[in-house]
């Protein structure tokens, strides 16, 4: 189980995360949702150690990740897959080279073993025929799928996704959401996604946490959202639905 206890984080004197305590569901698709600027991205990056909390703790099972040194954290990070917003692919590397990078950096596997794993992951995201392409030759949805393949190439226990469907059209967003959720279920991964997209919540969210102004305002299942007695959350749901409708009309 991944959990946070009383996480506080400030930037330039402004408190971005304020006393955040959450228990994420093991082997499930967990979503951190909220308006832009609510602290969702900062929380996600704090969970993986890209930001250090001013106070509070992040736990992986019975291990206090926050209190670990660099070497000890490195061992846990081997179990973490990360999908960065925009994909964060290396422009000068092919698709298969991008996916293989974690294996090159963190394992002593033979080249044959690495390529077997790379090919398996590319097949899983349905990009086996794009292995020799470069990022500039890919669509937005293909870039996201390469990022997913790279994130799972080390067979992680935990998968963190920073707005994985940002910049995508509604149909492609659904494809990416479903792919991440399928992988979560198939391999029993604990997945945590930061998103502003209510469609993601209603389609794949097994547990969702709503942040507002850096505080946890609500948590529950997608079924609970429909009956939530929380005006701020209800306003967010309505605004998200209207924004989605406007985008579809514009397209």
Please report, for each region that a protein language model flagged, where it lies by residue.
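Catalytic Walker B motif of ABC-type/P-loop ATPase nucleotide-binding domains
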Residues: 159-162
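Helix-to-loop junction immediately C-terminal to a conserved catalytic motif
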Residues: 48
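Conserved ABC ATPase "signature" region
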Residues: 64, 111-129
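Conserved ABC transporter NBD signature motif
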Residues: 56-64
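A short, proline-enriched helix->beta-strand linker immediately N-terminal to the Walker B motif
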Residues: 153-157
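Helix N-cap at the start of a conserved alpha-helix in ABC-type nucleotide-binding domains
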Residues: 170-172
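Conserved ABC ATPase signature
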Residues: 134-138, 142
